[in-house]
Structure formats: C-alpha cells, structure tokens
C-alpha cells in the first residue's frame, strides 16, 4: 500500500522477516525485506462511500442506471496497450473482476493470490478471472511478471472505471487500524509491496489513496449480478461469497 503524506513528515521504516515460502500465483518470496516509507504531498480527495454486496440480480440491477451508462464509455488497456471497452470483458461470458488499489499494493497482491487459488473452481464453471489496476501498462506487465497471476490483467490509467463505479478514495479509508493489521498479516504471510511501482507517477499523482472492489458480471454487458466496494484498504470479502455469486 503506497504511503503518501506531507513532504515534511518523518520517514520511518519497518523491517519484517517472514520465513521463505512459495505462494500460489505469486512464486517464491525472500525473507529479510526492509520496507521504507516514502512521503509526498498530495491533494486529499475522497469520493462518496458506497458499499454494497448484491447477488442474484440481473440486467444491471446491482449498479444504477447512471453507473451503467458511465461504464459504457470506459475503456481499459490490455497488456499490449490495446483499448478495450470494459463491458467487453463480460459481454459474452461471466467474469469475476477484481479492482486493485494500485499495482504495487501489498494488499492487492494478497487479493490476487486468494482469488487465483480458486481459479480452478471458476474455470470449471466457465468463469473468467480478471484484475484491473489504476496505472500504466508497464506497471501492469511488471505486476504480472512479479506475481505470475494466472488471470487476465488490464490497466486503467485514467481511473475511469473506478470513478464510474464510485469506488471510495481518501486518507481516512487508507490508514485505518484494520488496514494496518491487514498489512502486517500480509507481510508475515510473505507478500511484498513493490515500492518502485507504488511511487511511479501514475500512482503518486492520485496519492495512493484509491480503494477498489470486486464485481461479478456477465454474460451481457449490463448484467452485473454482484458488486462489493471496499470500505477501506484490505477489505476483502470472504472468497466463499464471491464463489457463490459466480459459480453456484
């Protein structure tokens, strides 16, 4: 999770040394990693907080007409830089679409892994696994190289999908007691923040405060049957809830 405060803030460091382990979908991680916090000045922007988890709905009932109309104009980039209307990702199939905070985020890498662990269940049900991150295609490709994520990965450099879905953003939903515990747990489990990715221009300009979510959609571009909007960093729903929405 990228940390960005005023440039006058004291720089701190945290050193955590979990045991060497191999994580499904992420490869082998090494012990003895030093996490150095970097701070920059940012504008504090926060979208409206909208949290919902809707299953069994159809014909776009999980999102409102205004949101559905906004999504019609959203395009994301594949790993080669090709523009794709976001609704094409589920127009002809059902898909679980996870939205990362950013491509360097340790909590998002854990989210990617816990979804990838259930990819065989999704495959058996004909459900695609997709991850979208706000950032550049270079960041997206680095994420794939580092994590070995087996699903599809797309970049949203303009944050258009996040704004259309009204995902929450702000300091108060990034630095919370629960989020801090989630970060520590993630490090002890062997996950790692990529600080180089976290402090690239595409992420820093937004302050690193963006939160994500998960939706289940398709087939049919207006068929979003489940949507979960993160209330704070690391707010992952139970994987059983997602599987019930996509594969029951």
UniProtKB/Swiss-Prot annotation:
* Keyword Transmembrane helix attached: no
List-wise, which residues carry N-acetylalanine?
Answer: 53
What's the superkingdom here? Eukaryota
Transit peptide residue numbers? 1-52
Q: Does the keyword Cell inner membrane apply?
A: no
* One Pfam family per UniProt: AhpC-TSA_2
| Keywords of this entry | Acetylation, Chloroplast, Plastid, Transit peptide
**Cellular localization per UniProt:** Plastid, Chloroplast
What GO cellular component term, any one, is given?
chloroplast
Q: Identify its protein family.
A: Belongs to the peroxiredoxin-like PRXL2 family. PRXL2C subfamily.
Q: Under what name is this protein listed? A: Thioredoxin-like protein AAED1, chloroplastic
């Amino acid at each position: 999770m990228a940390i960005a405060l005023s440039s006058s803030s004291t720089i701190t460091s945290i050193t955590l040394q979990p045991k060497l382990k191999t994580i499904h979908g992420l490869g082998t991680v090494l012990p003895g990693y030093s996490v150095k916090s970097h701070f920059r000045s940012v504008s504090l922007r926060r979208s409206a907080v909208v949290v919902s988890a809707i299953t069994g709905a159809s014909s776009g009932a999980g999102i409102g007409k205004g949101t559905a109309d906004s999504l019609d104009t959203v395009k994301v980039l594949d790993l080669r830089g090709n523009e794709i209307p976001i609704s094409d990702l589920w127009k002809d199939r059902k898909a679980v679409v996870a939205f990362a905070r950013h491509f360097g985020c340790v909590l998002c890498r854990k989210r990617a892994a816990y979804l990838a662990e259930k990819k065989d269940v999704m495959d058996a049900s004909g459900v695609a696994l997709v991850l979208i991150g706000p950032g550049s295609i270079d960041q997206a490709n680095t994420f794939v190289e580092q994590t070995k994520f087996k699903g599809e990965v797309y970049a949203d450099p303009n944050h258009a999908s996040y704004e259309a879905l009204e995902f929450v953003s702000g300091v108060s939903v990034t630095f919370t007691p629960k989020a801090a515990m989630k970060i520590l747990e993630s490090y002890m489990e062997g996950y790692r923040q990529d600080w180089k990715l976290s402090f690239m221009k595409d992420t820093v300009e937004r302050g690193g405060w963006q939160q994500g979510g998960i939706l289940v959609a398709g087939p049919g571009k207006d068929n979003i049957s489940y949507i979960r909007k993160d209330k704070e960093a690391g707010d992952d729903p139970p994987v059983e809830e997602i599987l019930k929405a996509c594969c029951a």
